């Protein structure tokens, strides 16, 4: 699918979609509980992968209007009858690899081409240290993965610099083992807010996990716990809302986005980023509304350590801002659905913007965006960010636009509803 974007601005009021990060975790924890109701979940390709995987591990999940009714396995996942195919969802792969380790049988997990190239070695090594037999069939740390259950609590270490999903996966599984676990993080924990989201959901389900954060971060996880999520309402998604807010800031127009209450989401940093760049923005935390009323943007330096999903959005903001925007501490952004640093550099270059790329850094020199045929890299965040660029440049066509179904299936409808000129076509 392709999308053609014309020069346009935005106006009006819109609701932010539900959080993908919270939805993944709520479904997983509910599937490990008994009876739960999840209100206003995000239903997208990625979260449907988690639903399907949880069902294969023994949970019963029914969609009833804007809620999910979940009868879980009470901490004892079954052995699936077939291979778990997670599609394009790295979150599902990492979470279900650890959850499958709680069972007694053998589980095989795989995914699409992108998933089969993403690293999982540190997670597999820790699971082996905790009494599980877990292997990458090709010996490269990537899917397909084979897990034979028997997860036991113990003392373990894991590298925190590649993906916080490894840590979240272990935090979801380890409280359900018979023995306690001590998990030490080596190096900087990248994308830490996503671990905070995991801890937030686990706390709401009654789990107890203790943190020691002196010289090195350490999680103390008592064993033999039970999850009881009961009822949970998924908050709005700041990652997805970043495109709506950035669109108004870039085009010097006005918008109000609802359903953005405070939570543990690190991507709420988009509000401070836009403010630092010169946008007129106001967040009413009590009402859960964010209003943007244009502004003259200038370049900034952004540390992407905690907020990798904002990198494509900020790269496009930098393309229209005065001066240079420098995105630092961003090597882990290369290990997403695609190498997002490289992808944004390549596509912005096509649109007339000067960029320079280093191992953990992307520099964007603000300039005049020009319409072009650009590649979406089969990556939802690349497609959505380039849509914003097209609204400034006009006459821009983006391929692999179907990638939006991963996290924001209604993205183009949402953008049209607030004034964006977007036209979809089959390739």
UniProtKB/Swiss-Prot annotation:
It catalyses: 3-phosphoshikimate + phosphoenolpyruvate = 5-O-(1-carboxyvinyl)-3-phosphoshikimate + phosphate. It is an enzyme of class 2 (transferase). Pathway: Metabolic intermediate biosynthesis; chorismate biosynthesis. GO terms for biological process: amino acid biosynthetic process; aromatic amino acid family biosynthetic process; chorismate biosynthetic process. It is found in: Cytoplasm. Its EC number is 2.5.1.19. Keywords: Amino-acid biosynthesis, Aromatic amino acid biosynthesis, Cytoplasm, Transferase. The active site is at residue 309. It holds the Pfam family EPSP_synthase. GO terms for cellular component: cytoplasm. Monomer. Catalyzes the transfer of the enolpyruvyl moiety of phosphoenolpyruvate (PEP) to the 5-hydroxyl of shikimate-3-phosphate (S3P) to produce enolpyruvyl shikimate-3-phosphate and inorganic phosphate. Belongs to the EPSP synthase family. This is 3-phosphoshikimate 1-carboxyvinyltransferase. It comes from Methanococcoides burtonii (strain DSM 6242 / NBRC 107633 / OCM 468 / ACE-M). The lineage of its organism: Archaea, Methanobacteriati, Methanobacteriota, Stenosarchaea group, Methanomicrobia.
